[in-house]
Swiss-Prot record:
Keywords: Chromatin regulator, Cytoplasm, Cytoskeleton, Microtubule, Mitochondrion, Nucleus, Phosphoprotein. It comes from the Eukaryota. InterPro entries: AB_hydrolase_fold, KANL3/Tex30_Abhydrolase, KANSL3_1st, NSL3/Tex30. Residues 551-561, 860-877 have a biased composition (Polar residues). Component of the NSL complex at least composed of KAT8/MOF, KANSL1, KANSL2, KANSL3, MCRS1, PHF20, OGT1/OGT, WDR5 and HCFC1. One of its GO terms (biological process) is positive regulation of transcription by RNA polymerase II. Its main location: nucleus. The lineage of its organism: Eukaryota, Metazoa, Chordata, Craniata, Vertebrata. Non-catalytic component of the NSL histone acetyltransferase complex, a multiprotein complex that mediates histone H4 acetylation at 'Lys-5'- and 'Lys-8' (H4K5ac and H4K8ac) at transcription start sites and promotes transcription initiation. The NSL complex also acts as a regulator of gene expression in mitochondria. Within the NSL complex, KANSL3 is required to promote KAT8 association with mitochondrial DNA. Required for transcription of intraciliary transport genes in both ciliated and non-ciliated cells. This is KAT8 regulatory NSL complex subunit 3. Residues 523-550, 680-691 have a biased composition (Low complexity). Residues 478-511 have a biased composition (Basic and acidic residues). GO terms for cellular component: histone acetyltransferase complex; mitochondrion; NSL complex; nucleus. The gene is Kansl3. Residues 478-561, 599-618, 670-691, 735-757, 843-877 are annotated as: Disordered.
Amino acid sequence: MAHRGGERDFQTSARRMGTSLLFQLSVHERELDLVFLDHSYAKPWSAHPDASSARPTRMLFVTPRRQQENTIESDVPIDVETVTATPAPLYDNQKARSVMNECERHVIFARTDADAPPPPEDWEEHVNRTGWTVAQNKLFNKILKALQSDRLARLANEGACNEPVLRRVAVDKCARRVRQALASVSWDTKLIQWLHTTLVETLSLPMLAAYLDALQTLKGKIPTLIDRMLVSSNTKTGAAGAEALSLLLKRPWDPAVGVLSHNKPSKLPGSPLILIASSGPSSSVFPASRRHRFWQSQLSCLGKVIPVATHLLNNGSGVGVLQCLEHMTGAVRSKVLEIHSHFPHKPIILIGWSTGALVACHVSVMEYVTAVVCLGFPLLTVDGPRGDVDDPLLDMKTPVLFVIGQNSLQCHPEAMEDFREKIRAENSLVVVGGADDNLRISKAKKKSEGLTQSMVDRCIQDEIVDFLTGVLTRAEGHVGSEPRDQDAEKKKKPRDVARRDLAFEIPERGSRPASPAARLPTSPSGSEDLSSVSSSPTSSPKTKGTTVTSAQKSSQIGTSQLLRRHVQRTDAVLTHRQAQVPISSEPVEEVEKEELRVQLKRHHPSSPLPGAKPSKRPKIKVSLISQGDTVGGPCTLSQGGTPEAAGGKPITMTLGASAGAKELTGLLTTAKSSSSEGGVTASAAPSVASSNATPNAIHTLQSRLVATSPGSSLPGAASASSLLQGLSFSLQDISSKTTGLPGSPSPGPAPQATSVKLPTPMQSLGAITTGTSTIVRTIPVATTLSSLAATPGGKPTAIHQLLTNGGLAKLASSLPGLAQISNQASGLKVPTTITLTLRGQPSRITTLSPMGSGAAASEEPNSQMLPSSSQRLPPAP
């Protein structure tokens, strides 16, 4: 009695909860785990390290087995005084009774002559069977027997606590018998029309109500045949009667209509696309079953449903079973790839019935999907049960939900448990009590539990929603955290110079197919962390080079370790490229290294915000490189070379971190040397920024400082000068042990663009097209040699004159043809970066010409050198 009282309390509380009623109908929600209640140290199933990926089985309406007591008492007390209250039904009883008696209230609309008196109770004796054929008598007797059985069931169930459910079961049984009787005459049109007219005119009102209930049930299953049957009566009753009868027979009544209307399923998170794999080749002769259509409409409440149909040529004539399965699998797989190409960020869920569930599982092994739902999974095959060593389904990595019936013939629950233990993927199992392969519960289960099929289907749908919500939430959180982590990584200041570069790492690919969304850039700006991919619009994707912007380089790296990591991680694309730079053979002292480290930390600013609006003014990068005289010629240095081997540590300085701030990057490499000659190089190169829409073209400007005549402003560069106005710079005094700088021209490096070798100085504006379709402009520029002289204080005046207010604008004004290059009509864009490289080298001048990420150096002839009238620059105090 205590158990019944607890069951009654649960039902009462469940009815109060309203919308969450159906989800709490399952047995696993009713039964409390006494171990978890009594023992606080109890752990969940997944706490064990050897726990498999199979989650505990969830039971829906599975009656727990209770062991019978062996001891039988001799005297059993019988309580005859206590009144047992009737348990409240799981649905709205008042509304269920209202729809149950609908046909009885409107039975008058079915009669052809509404004004005629109703037939008496002994109507069967007044039926005139004169002139009936044997087929007519036989058909009439079958229908009458089915209606009499339904009448007896109604009288027996009258007043029961769950009368609507019992009435629904009796009506379904009567409808099945009527359908069998009509099928015995092959649905002969004349015969079934005669039968319907006779029954409507002769049946009593209670029997006619039962007949209308049967027609209402059959109208939802076989509407065409029922409409053919009602043609003769519609002509007699008129338009009004026909319309009323049509509305009455529109859909069968359901006791749980109130509960289902209040418990609407919610949409799944992430707006997934639900693909329904077909269970066989589609055909116009055999359309999809009514139950499959019903489930398709139910799943449409969760998300966008896309049924995948398989069409065979010539209605499948000459096509074997294996070929048909290959066509079905290929159709689903092609649909998955098509959706991935159009909606790469949309999660895809595969759902299938029976054979379609197997197809969905096989497709999930080959292509990336978010989850798989198998309804009525067929575990038994013609070759035996699944789960052998060579079963490809054991390699599944996609989360999968199996929904099977307790009385299923193709899948036993115990065998399904063994199969789930072998699957590597996260999987769950839902067992529907008393259900068959199509998840339809039996009539005995409906009577004992007080359920209808619609309530069971809604509970199954709730289980599917619960499983998919967890999977989609975890997947959405995992994908959504990546761009947030990358943005935070860009904003914060890195503390370790030698930290690993995550942007160049290749993600490990497991046996599960990778998501297409992971292949797309997750940063809002479309660029990777620490790098931006730059290429020409006409260049192929294989020749794209990866460059590091000056702002990111100044804030995150101070040595050539980035280039080393870059080459190691992208050697598959860039192994054919090399870089040649002059190297000093003498080591750098530890004191100088320490000073450079201090200056490096002092001038490190925070890196700019990735989401800030880019400035329209060009950025200026100044590099000052001084090399020793021990360099006899160009030496080959891999990009993975250590900074110590390059003859010193570079110093990177940037002024301004906001979008509109002016930036200055000075790169200094010091080394012990006794040379008296060097080189001065100025080059202008725009930086390349890649965006989500279309990448900007690469336009490189290289200028030569030819120390022959005093610098003067040229009238053709007014627009370029206006671009650089207002830029103010300052450079901290740099302690150096280098010697004087002669005015020898040399093409400077453009670290953010593509350059080519220039054998001779060009005296006019020229264009050279490289292998990657990049335009290179070479502009000769005149300047004075006296500007490179040293001041009495020992500070290089050339740098100060170049970097003071207006000095860089004068330099831009001295670039001929810059206005023509920046002209929008010519198809080229305004330069975004001007790179100035001041290099001091021995008599043999070496040119660094980057080519994408790697570069090939070219040696300038001695004829390009100016008269040796260099002046020494003493070291700064």
